[in-house]
Amino acid sequence: GLEETYCSMKIK
């Protein structure tokens, strides 16, 4: 969900 997208943003 949103958390998954947030993690992707943090990695990038």
Curated annotation (Swiss-Prot):
Oligomeric form and interacting partners: Hexamer; each subunit is composed of an acidic and a basic chain derived from a single precursor and linked by a disulfide bond.
GO molecular function: nutrient reservoir activity
Taxonomic source organism: Elaeis guineensis var. tenera
Keyword Disulfide bond: yes
Organism lineage: Eukaryota, Viridiplantae, Streptophyta, Embryophyta, Tracheophyta
Family named by the database record: Belongs to the 11S seed storage protein (globulins) family.
Signal peptide: none
Protein keywords: Disulfide bond, Seed storage protein, Storage protein
Role of this protein: Seed storage protein.
Record-given protein name: Globulin 1
